[in-house]
Regions:
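Internal alpha/beta domain cores that form substrate/cofactor-binding pockets in large enzymes
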Residues: 14-18, 23-31, 44-46, 50-51
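Conserved short alpha-helical elements in the N-terminal third of ANL/AMP-binding
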Residues: 1-15, 29, 34
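AMP-binding/adenylate-forming catalytic core of the ANL superfamily
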Residues: 146, 178-257
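Conserved ATP-binding/catalytic segment of the ANL
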Residues: 129, 136, 143-198, 203
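Conserved ATP-binding loop and adjacent catalytic segment of the adenylate-forming AMP-binding
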Residues: 15-18, 86-139, 148-152, 161-165, ...
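Short hydrophobic/charged patches on amphipathic alpha-helices used for structural packing
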Residues: 25, 63-66, 210
């Protein structure tokens, strides 16, 4: 709400709120927005609809078609609420549409990091840390301090004490998210509650594994737990394709499970 509602109201911009993803594209044609604020699911939906057509002429005209889908006037697209999958991000980037991705929580009012359009950006990250926000990674968890951190939950001291901790004369908010910081950029690895321990003693995050698999597997897949020889179900159109995916995933997942 801070980004899409309050910011635009302060600057007296015209604001339209979509009534649902089913009518999102039709609404874009009618409203012709200059800026879009969306969740990743909307961008995934647009990508899937275009790829479903799978016609050479459409692929040739993709940059123009994408702009038309969003009403024809879109200059900026902001994505938030969840991590944008790398294949989706790359799809739009390849077609001259840059997605600005940010990260934050309601408890931090809300921004913690953002990938700006103009400044140096790292598209694999969830953005560069804001100047007035302090972020530390404690036991793998993203923790935040600064003037944007809430005072607490209304009339719920127990819940407040569970997420706010005092350290170095500052109040830190425990996000419950796993991440790391490199060169001032924040990288999201998933929810800490999605971490589980393998039989070899190593920890792995389900969301991070899903992200790697989804880069190379277009069909639905399931990660359903740890077994002696297998813990995921992936469908492919041929044995050759399966063997190709297995080789790629073995290399990629070894970088994630460490």
């Amino acid at each position: 709400q801070t980004c899409e509602l309050y910011y635009n109201l302060i600057y007296d911009n015209k604001l339209a709120i979509s009534t649902g993803k089913e009518v999102f594209m039709q609404e874009c044609k009618e409203i012709k927005p200059d800026v879009l604020y969306v969740v990743p699911k909307v961008l995934e939906m647009v990508k899937q609809k275009i790829e479903f057509l799978d016609k050479p002429l459409i692929k040739l005209l993709l940059p123009r078609l994408l702009k038309k889908i969003f009403g024809g006037n879109v200059q900026y697209i902001f994505s938030g609420g969840a991590k944008l999958k790398e294949p989706v991000k790359q799809f739009f980037s390849d077609n001259n549409i840059v997605i600005c991705e940010g990260y934050g929580c309601s408890e931090t009012a809300p921004m913690i990091s953002v990938n700006h359009f103009e400044s140096p950006r790292d598209t694999e990250s969830i953005g560069k840390l804001l100047d007035n926000v302090l972020v530390e990674i404690i036991d793998g968890e993203i923790q935040v301090a600064g003037p944007n951190v809430m005072l607490g939950y209304w009339e719920d001291k127990e819940k407040t004490n569970a997420v706010l901790v005092k350290r170095d004369d500052k109040v830190w908010y425990k996000t419950g998210d796993s991440g790391e910081i490199k060169d001032g950029f924040l990288y999201y690895k998933g929810r800490l509650s999605d971490n589980y321990k393998l039989s070899n003693g190593k920890f792995v995050n389900v969301q991070e594994v899903e992200g790697v698999i989804s880069e190379f597997v277009q069909a639905p897949f399931i990660i359903y737990g740890e077994h002696d020889s297998h813990n995921a179900l992936i469908t492919t159109e041929s044995i050759d394709k399966l063997n190709e995916i297995k080789i790629i995933l073995q290399e990629k997942l070894n970088l994630v499970i460490k």
